[in-house]
Amino acid sequence: MSDDDFMQDSDQEYDFEYEDDEEEDTGDVDIENKYYNAKQTKTSDPEEALQEFLSIPPLEQEKGDWGFKALKQAIKLEFKLKRYQEATEHYEELLTYVKSAVTRNYSEKSIDNMLNYIEKGYDDPKAVQCIEKFYSLTLQCFQSTNNERLWLKTNIKLARLLLDRKDYHAVARKLRELHNACRKSDGTDDPSKGTYSLEIYALEIQMYSETRNNNQLKVLYQKALKVRSAVPHPKIQGVIRECGGKMHMSEENWKEAQSDFFEAFRNYDEAGDLRRIQVLKYLLLTTMLMKSDINPFDSQEMKPYRNDPRIFAMTELVDAYQRDDIYRYEDVLQKNTDLLADPFIAENIDEVTRNMRTKGVVKLIAPYTRMRISWLAERLRITEPEVMDILSFLIVDGRVKGRIDEHKGVLELESREDADHVQAITVLSEAVGNLFNAVFKSTDGFQPGQGDFMNSMADQSADIGSLDDTMRSMGSGKRGRRVGLTQRAY
């Protein structure tokens, strides 16, 4: 072969290789165009977009970025269209790309975002089964890749799913596994995994809060507050503080509960979490339980929510409570029954209502010395047994001086004048008793050494003398008492 023939063959070979590269580039461009065209139509025509995305992976000679991206979009669309079985199958296909087709960091971030996306479907029972399958497939896939971060994140999400399902035994097992993964070989917490530890504590605190295990809740709550090696997401801090507030409420520690609910509200607000509205209601609830006259909306963080319609009913309740307006308070409760849809509010509002009615009773009985229980019940719009219960508490507590005649259904109050008369008679009775003992039981006369006794007798005589005036005034006192008792309410 001549040199010219050789050069000609070489040129032909070179041209052929160049043409192959050009065809490959053209193929990539076609796939890219197909991908972006599908993205543009996924809102207007999700069905067409879904078919376009699913047609991309077979076009690649080897698994690559465009197939990975197309499958991600297809799975999200299928999940949105509630085609959970198809979404699960394509997610399983997507996981085959993570070992070689895409980089480790990109695959980890993409999978984590995908799991965050599907978490929005917790309200649909069918979606929950699909979500759990996604978690299971993810853990199986990354178990062999030694990707601890994604393993921890996925297991935390799975524990949260189990908690939402109230499968507490499964949650407890999963949390033990996670705690062990966040500890060093000597059993102490690993500072490098502080953020994960705090998330795990938050889940465990939620579990004990829901199961009313206050002993364990206290221990974990204190542990969580002492974690300093983490930069927690404000939502996690909000969860911890909210559970802390509920714990303090169960112990009737209103002040600490208010402090924790405020911190929970502030953190949820910072995270943009809608839970802030519910916690704000709890904060207003503790304001009433503390019997505080301070307007909670004076704080900088709460001012923007002063006129928020979502908390209008609670704001009205607080205003009525602070004004001692029992009628308005009861009207707000009757017109806003949805307030009691929250079990926590329903459980604690009774204490506020009782305080409100107690203040109403004290206010009503103030001008009178005698009144019927039925009259009080009618004025307060409650039953007679409820009035009796409140009055009994006030009498035992010493805030009301009086007695209840259950047979007649009447409350009789002691006036100040009545109390003075009773005290005077008591002193007189004791003095007469002492005099009787001295005069009639001493048969041997006065003996030497009884000077102290004589002095004592002189003092008693003085006491009796001073009581004469009191006894003389009892006639007019009785008249005054009779006048007082005519101040009645029936």
Curated annotation (Swiss-Prot):
The keyword Cytoplasm applies. InterPro entries: 26S_Proteasome/COP9_Components, PCI_dom, WH_DNA-bd_sf. GO terms for cellular component: COP9 signalosome; cytoplasm. SUPFAM superfamilies: Winged helix' DNA-binding domain. One of its GO terms (biological process) is protein deneddylation. SMART domains: PAM, PINT. Pfam families: PCI (PF01399). It comes from the Eukaryota. Component of the COP9 signalosome (CSN) complex that acts as an regulator of the ubiquitin (Ubl) conjugation pathway by mediating the deneddylation of the cullin subunit of SCF-type E3 ubiquitin-protein ligase complexes. The CSN complex is involved in the regulation of the circadian clock through its control of the stability of the SCF(FWD-1) complex. This is COP9 signalosome complex subunit 2. The lineage of its organism: Eukaryota, Fungi, Dikarya, Ascomycota, Pezizomycotina. The gene is csn-2.
